[in-house]
Amino acid sequence: MSGACREVVTLQLGHYSNFIGTHWWNLQDAGLVYDADVPAGELQSDVLFREGLTLAGHVTYTPRLIAIDLKGSLQTLRKEGSLYDTENENSAFTWDGQIMTHQESPPSKNSFLQELDNLDTGGVLAESDFNHLTSSVDNCSVPGASVAVETINSSLERIQKSYRLEGSVRVWSDFLRLHLHPRTISVINQYNHDGESERLEVFGQGEALLQGQVLEDLEDRLHFFIEECDYLQGFQVLCDLTDGFSGLGSKVTEYLQDSYGGRGILTWGVAPVNHPDTSSMKDLYHMMNCALGTLQMANHSSLFCPLTLRGGLCRRPPPPTAFPLLNCDPLLWYHSSSVLALALDALTVSYRMRHCSATMWQLSDALTTSGRKVVSAYGSVPFPMMLGGCLPDALDAFSNAVPWRSLSACPEISDRRFCFSQSVTLKGVDEQSLVSRLLPGMEAPSPLHYERSGEDVLSAYVRSHYPSSPLAVQLVSSGSKVTPPFPQIFSPSLSAQGFLQSHSTPASPSCPPVSCLPVLTSLQSSPAVGLQLSELQRACASLDLRRVAPSFLTHGPEHAEISEYLEQLRNLAHCYRQSHSRSSSEEDDDD
């Protein structure tokens, strides 16, 4: 049974969080179907979206979202959005003297935003922007997923045009494809997004922000979205981990825990591979912010998970995570955030399903036993499966290797066959392809081909690698729709549906781009998390901040408090130890 819709409020804190969030909301928006005759999908969009009315009586469907960023971060996007006309409101004017008006030219919009505006006002794109209107777009394995009426969604889905926004994306609003509610965007004017002065760089600055007007503004926005919820299940928080937003996120999650106890708080601490205009001192700041933010947000959340393509969270990390079927530039935020958004789309499936969903607190309770509130994410983006193939064949192709790579900067461990618990999700493989198509009398290539359901196939495969771990499995046949403005970062060996082809297809105007992807993810509590936390704690504890970075202490916490926090981080890392997984270096830490 589907049961009642359990709503979620999303908070995005920081610029990179909003990069990931923008891609993630674009993916959700692309999956919406506006035809009432089409059967309801597997994912319940009302969990994330809210229905409303404009002053003119028009029905709106917008994210239940609070997005916080700094002054100068919006560019062409109005803070109040464009659903409600606020420019024509009359203002009382009492000055009788001479008035001089200075008009500043607005920032220019890229080609995607210009054409989106044209569609939004009822315009039609040029005929050259379309390529075989009805034949080139696949419906990502969802029966009847075509849109019967012309909408912005259906128009964007049919556009066979590569915008190549890599050179024009400066901020996250440069590729935002959906409308936001006027209560969504909150700008912190005390700090600048760009420039050399008034930057939000250290943990203590962020901690000190959540008071006065900033706190009142957050409370008002939360009350607005929460009061209209019938069955609020909790909050999903995306928070920048490497700058001062880690301190703000610590205070925001603490406020949510104190004010809405019993609701789930799933926090994703996000970090880009690189930062513009970085330096050795800023790299030190980034590492300290990661350590303090991880500890504090884990303390105040039901579950905390780092989400990044970085190879590690310390100052000199290994190379970033790469996926063989993606031509992704990890240094480009527009690219790296799109990969993380695809993974997040699958990682959050369990509490968004229409039927047999697990609530946020059920997911967190299963993964965070014995005080292990930090978990790690892994993904196969996209999941490599042959066009026309089956899931058992795709999994067998990995042989003894696991099919995913780290999305949490976790180190490799010698014994990968153990984890405390995990939740695995596969999106984008239709029901007919989940099991083997063996004819009677045929010998099965592997035990997976004997399984009779997709859940059994995936469970059997995962248990072969993690034989003693509690496991939850979710399957969703609809893939992630990567229509414009998602970057075309995909290997030419992928079909339009995101599956492997026997022969690579060179890019050409006659070949439709990839419009849908299968994705496999795993959310794990494992000893690898303990190794990561230990490495981060040791690197931070080895620094004498009073000597090498006294400016980090200017806004707090004090040096003694930081020492106490690092000791708590060390104790948290110890929670992930098992006698059979200890290394000699870890044993030394016990002394």
UniProtKB/Swiss-Prot annotation:
Residues in the signal sequence: none
Pfam families: Misat_Tub_SegII, Tubulin_3
Principal subcellular localization: mitochondrion
Cellular compartment(s): Mitochondrion outer membrane; Cytoplasm
Gene3D superfamilies: Tubulin/FtsZ, GTPase domain (3.40.50.1440)
Keyword Cytoplasm: yes
SUPFAM superfamilies from the UniProt entry: Tubulin nucleotide-binding domain-like
Record's keyword annotation contains Membrane: yes
GO cellular component, one term: cytoplasm
InterPro entries named in the record: DML1/Misato (IPR049942), DML1/Misato_tubulin (IPR029209), Misato_II_tubulin-like (IPR019605), Tubulin/FtsZ_GTPase_sf (IPR036525)
GO biological process, one term: mitochondrion organization
Domain of life of the native organism: Eukaryota
Keyword set, alphabetical order: Cytoplasm, Membrane, Mitochondrion, Mitochondrion outer membrane
Family to which the UniProt record says this protein belongs: Belongs to the misato family.
Function field: Involved in the regulation of mitochondrial distribution and morphology. Required for mitochondrial fusion and mitochondrial network formation.
Designated name of the protein: Protein misato homolog 1
Biological source species: Danio rerio
